[in-house]
Design a protein with these regions (language model features):
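A conserved P-loop NTPase coupling/switch region
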Residues: 117-122, 129-199, 203
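Conserved NTPase motor "head" modules and their coupling/switch loops across ABC/AAA+ ATPases, GTPases
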Residues: 1-31, 45, 64, 185-203, ...
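Structural recognition of the conserved hydrophobic beta-strand(s) that form the central parallel beta-sheet
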Residues: 72, 344-351
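Walker B catalytic acidic pair
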Residues: 322-324
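Conserved lysine of the Walker
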Residues: 36
């Protein structure tokens, strides 16, 4: 996958910007708060209309304007081999609540606009930003989200299963919560309904865990090899799936803990309570990893995510790396600079000195104005 060009209008602090990226490395330099991450975020919106930083529609549109507009030309690897002169042309708009078309809409090759979420899967990308460091130190929810987000991009059917599981889980938790006096269901009725919900949860939960395990079998060797190279063999990373149940065992676990869940008033078991353990030299990274080690762990995971997607789909995602070199020693920086030249990569940095000798395109962002160096 390649981004051939991008035109940005009225997006956050960017009034107008034109980007013609290189085939491999494109660097956006500038001081903090100038709009570098905004430009990276604009590229990420092409993956399905969502921001990796969050934000309401009005927050994405430049102050005083009704719309933000992104116009991009993209080329898939298969197109590049077979139809090099026919890129996809994408137009994405973000409208404020009081505009003529509120919300996020996208049009591909002149077709009628549709919800931008429909772009999912058409522009594969992997993003790293400093907020992703919480993958290491944060709660298990963030690590589960990392796995599930990757799987949703790779397998559209996974999103269907995942949403169904969450919907049934919500119904179960509502049933388990204690109702106000006089509104409680009869005990027998409550247990009968709980059994029905658990049956559905077991079916969907088994599918979720199985897909996570299979994906991790592919991801783990890639991530661990990345970390070994990043650390020059000084440290060893391991990934383990911390499961609550063995394959085929969720139904029995739900039945065994049913009374405990009733007393607790909430669901206590299932894939929504599992974790991805990250270890450095056999020790939990969430406890012992330094800032630099945390960054190296997450970068190893993100590069592995891109490599795994390339193997599974035949399309290498575009890499978007925000402030990636901070808190890394010179050896790790040099390794990353080498890896960045393998596929199309966009990277932001406050300091351009590390990139001036590379073959990539270098831009500078200043007050929302983009210029080529």
């Amino acid at each position: 996958m390649r981004l051939l060009s991008l035109e940005v209008t009225n997006y956050r602090n960017i009034a107008s910007a034109s980007l013609t990226p290189g085939r491999e490395l494109t660097v956006i330099c500038g001081n903090n708060g100038q709009g570098k991450t905004n430009l990276l975020e604009a590229i990420w919106l092409l993956t399905g209309g969502k921001s990796f930083r969050g934000g309401k529609d009005a927050e994405l549109v430049r102050r005083g304007e009704p719309f933000a507009v992104l116009e991009a030309s993209t080329l898939r690897a298969q197109q590049e081999e077979q139809e090099p002169d026919e890129p996809n042309r994408v137009r994405l708009t973000v409208g404020t609540p009081d505009s003529q078309r509120p919300g996020r809409y996208a049009s591909v090759n002149g077709a009628a606009p549709r919800r931008a979420a429909g772009l999912a899967g058409s522009f594969p990308a992997v993003v790293f930003d400093p907020g992703h460091l919480s993958l290491v130190k944060g709660a298990p929810e963030g690590r589960r989200k990392f796995l599930d987000a990757a799987l949703c991009q790779l397998y559209p059917g996974y999103l269907t299963v995942y949403r169904r599981y969450l919907r049934v889980l919500q119904q179960k938790n509502a049933l388990l919560r204690r109702s106000p006096a006089g509104q409680e269901r009869p005990y027998a009725e409550k247990m009968a309904l709980l059994e029905v919900l658990n049956t559905e949860l077991a079916a969907q939960g088994e599918a979720i865990q199985q897909r996570r395990r299979t994906y991790l079998e592919r991801l783990a060797p890639l991530a661990c090899a990345n970390y070994e190279e990043l650390s020059h063999g000084a440290e060893r990373m391991e990934l383990r799936y911390a499961a609550q149940f063995e394959p085929g065992g969720l139904a029995a676990l739900l039945k065994a803990r049913q009374n405990e869940e009733v007393r607790a008033g909430q669901s206590l078991c299932g894939p929504h309570r599992e974790d991805l353990e990250l270890l450095l030299d056999g020790q939990p990274a969430r406890v012992f990893a330094s800032q630099g080690q945390q960054r190296s762990v997450v970068l190893s995971l993100k590069m592995a995510e891109a490599a795994a997607a390339a193997v599974i789909t035949g399309e290498h995602p575009v890499l978007l790396l925000d402030d990636v070199l901070s808190e890394l020693d010179d050896g790790r920086k040099q390794y990353l600079l080498t890896r960045m030249r393998e596929k199309q990569t966009f990277v932001t940095s406050c300091d351009d000195t590390a990139f001036l000798k590379t073959d990539g395109e270098v831009y500078r962002m200043n007050g929302g104005v983009l210029s080529r160096v």
